[in-house]
Every structure is written in structure tokens, then in C-alpha cells.
Amino acid sequence: MIRDIDENLARSLTAETVELLPFLPYLLQDLWELGSSPRDMITLIKRHIPLSENSKILDLACGKGAVSVRIAESLGVHVHGFDLFPDFVKYAEQKAAEFGVDKLCRFTCGDANETVETERNYDCVIFGAAGNILGEPRETLEKLAKTIKFNGFIIIDEAYLPDDMTNDDVKYQNYEYLTRGEWLQLFDECGLTLVEELQNTDDYDFDSDNKLISTRTDELIAKHPDKRAIFENYVASQLNECEDLESNITAITWILQKKD
């Protein structure tokens, strides 16, 4: 079970093997945002979620806290972020203090699969670009739904396969992508209403991120030459995923509401 969790965690961060997990904080040390767009999340929350001083948001697999901190800063709402990497949690806490929202943000080191069994009654849960760490899509949606109130919201950052593509066309084979139609059917079967979707239209600078990661990769190869293949495969996976996002799959952010 632990091995499965580690493997899913590795894949969610574009790592081909669990052997890379101890090195991911080093490889990603120059990045704050690790996949999701805080701006898109804030836009969807503003449009659809009635907030009050008692509102609370759960950010699962929160990474370094970019989404949590930006939401707290922009909306003045309480956010509780969970991530499995202690280094990421520490960085998130530092960023919350830097942005003056440490009273609104709380970060905990923990496994998302355990978190969904204990956290309850949130107004919204965010699951941003975390892949299949909670299981297959149906299982993921069911687990997320348990953490929110009736009529609460799920914001999920995902990608789907265009109708004219197959999974064989995807370069980074981390899991099987569903089509948009398959996702919509799944939402309905899980008692979730699609409220809005935002296609990823940000002109995100993948090249800059990849250069930073490549530099850190070279540093690690110098320190651990016996692991050269693992590090180089990680860079290749990053490049393949970026190419997929640009050409082969459609990145999307959905806001869903739990039906009565």
C-alpha cells in the first residue's frame, strides 16, 4: 500500500521511479507554483462560492502552498493545506508569513489518502494537478466529496484527452487520460454538478522552469553520478509532459458542486 502511494506521488510530480522522491525538493527548489494556476482557482472561487469569515478551504497535495497563500491573500479566507513533503510544507509556511497570511493559512505534512478520511465540512476542496494519488478518477472524486459540506465545491485541476486522440498519442505515460465526455459522465454518476470549466490559457513559461530543473539536475548528477539515468529520465519526463500539455491533451480546471 505504501509502495503504491509512493509510486502515485512520484508520477504526480513527473517522476518515473520512487527512487527520485528524496531528490524532488532539491530539483524543484527554484519553483513555487508546481502545476496549478492560483489565478484560475481564485477566479472560480470568486464567481461561484459564497464566502464568509467562517468559510474554510482544503488544499490537498498543496505542494509549496502557492495556491493556498494566494487564495488567502486575495480572499481573506482560511485555507488548510496538506502535502507529503516536509520541505514543501516548511516552504509554504515561510511563504504564508512572507505574504502576511500566516494567520489564515495552516499547513500540515500528511498523506492525502489519510487526510480525506479525517477532514470534513469544508466549503471547498482543491485538488490541483495531483494526478492519481487518490486513485482512479471515480475513487478520487468520491474521496474529495467526503471532505466538503452538502452543496460544497470541488476544484480539480486535470487534463482530458481530445476526441481525436488516444492515450497512445500521449508522450508522458503516467496514467490513462479520460475524454471530456467520460469525465462528464463520471461527475454525474458521483453526484457532482459541473458549474464551470476553465481551459488553461496561461502563457506559462515552461521553458524557464525546465531550465531551472535542468540546472539542478546537473548539480545532482555531479554529486550522485550513479543516479545519472534517474535524473536524466526525470528531465525527459518533464519535457514530454510539457509537450503533451501544448499538443496532445487539454489542461482544464473544473469547479464542481456536490448535489443534495
Specify the residue positions occupied by each region the protein language model found.
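A short SAM/SAH-binding and catalytic strip from SAM-dependent methyltransferases
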Residues: 124-136
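Conserved Class I S-adenosyl-L-methionine
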Residues: 198-260
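Short, glycine-/aromatic-enriched active-site segment of Class I SAM-dependent methyltransferases
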Residues: 155-175
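A short glycine-rich, Lys/Arg-flanked "PGG" loop and its adjoining helix->strand segment in the class I
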Residues: 138-153
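N-terminal, positively charged/glycine-rich alpha-helical extensions of SAM-dependent methyltransferases
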Residues: 1-25
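Class I SAM-dependent methyltransferase SAM/SAH-binding core
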Residues: 58, 66-114
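A short acidic, Gly/Pro-enriched loop at the edge of an enzyme's catalytic core
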Residues: 116-125
